[in-house]
Amino acid sequence: TIVMSATYRQSSRMDAAAVERDPENVLLSRGPRFRLSAEMIRDQALAVSGLLSDKMYGPSVQPLRPNLGLKAAFGGSTDWKTSPGEDRFRRGIYTSWRRSMPYPSMAAFDAPSRNVCTIRRGRTNTPLQALVTLNDPVYVEAAQALARRIVAEGGTSTNERALYGFRLV
């Protein structure tokens, strides 16, 4: 399994010989030193699946998110209408953010609250983060698109598709 592989179990400690042979870590000679930020995790899932929009600039977008069905004290809903077309798959930095109702998947991955200036982000590792990647509508849609992409582009045999999927991810 992947978790038991030598590459997965590597330390993030820098070995001088490995750094000399593989300074950019292309050959995966060491583990990552930290996990990606909240926005980058979402962007990576969309990029691998082929859904990430490369559209730059413009107003904030409202990507797909779970409906919470809550009503604010003065009649406003906490749910939003998902942006149409490719806007729903734009990079995380374009996501609309309300301090009173942050984007749930990014909040789970320690995105700043925007209440105060954040110089350094904390990084946690919680079971909730795993549940977000399994159940959040954006990640489910990205997983489905990745599966369709592997079937369409990965060849005809199961082995070819598995190898193609491994190389994509």
Question: What are the functions of these language-model segments?
Answer:
Residues 6-164, 168:
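An acidic, gly/pro-interrupted, aromatic-rich
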